[in-house]
Curated annotation (Swiss-Prot):
This is NAD-capped RNA hydrolase NudC. Zn(2+) binds at residues 99, 102, 117, 122. Residues 128-252 form the Nudix hydrolase domain. Belongs to the Nudix hydrolase family. NudC subfamily. GO terms for cellular component: cytosol.
Amino acid sequence: MNAIQPDDAGYWLLTQDSALYLINGELPQGKAADFQLQGYNGMIIGELNGRPLWLVEEIADDQRTYFSLRSLLALPEAHFNLLNRGVELNHFFKTHRFCGKCGHPTDLVQQEWAIQCQNPSCSHRTYPVICPCIIVAVRRGAQILLANHQRHKGGIYTTLAGFVEVGETFEQAVHREVLEETGIQIQNLRYFGSQPWAFPNSAMIGFLADYAGGEICVQEMEIHDAQWFDYNAPLPELPPKGTIALKLIEHTLQLCAEEERKAT
């Protein structure tokens, strides 16, 4: 990152953890001097609506009002993913100021998203840490399996998800997570899509699966409730628009409807 100049212009991405500085629900746009950003460190990380998107290094004790990145989920996917990039990069820079190998300070690498140790005898280079997390929609005939997680207790019902463990494939993680959290066995696993998820540094890897056996028995530390829901019956509160979870649910409900049409 370099010192921002008063006449530098574009969109400005200021972050505090997974929150953004917004003005009337939008990123500030204009010259750096318009928002008193000159002198802070920043860099261009992409283009938004034909203008540069500047990432500003996190400002300690900033008195501006910040809003959760989740509030912008309805943005076009490419725009939301670009904001994800900024949030994840600032998290990476903030948590890797020192070399994890020798403890010396690090510098930002100019040619790529990376930091490098200042110690000439080390020069260890580190790249942004991305923690993959599988997410899966499970179908049984014309029904979908939805769970109310402990963190959403009494609220949203959604698909099952969990982090991939060391030495585990994505597919193995899906089978393990579904079995651990609900006692359900699955089959016909297939890839659906993915989504960057800067809370703070994940990537959601989406799958579809079919029921193979078992009865629901929830892992109470993680899951408050799990049920099979008929696709054409009233559904509980679902994840917000823009999430891969909702896309998985909507796609699975379509598959449920097709299954019922075939049966009749």
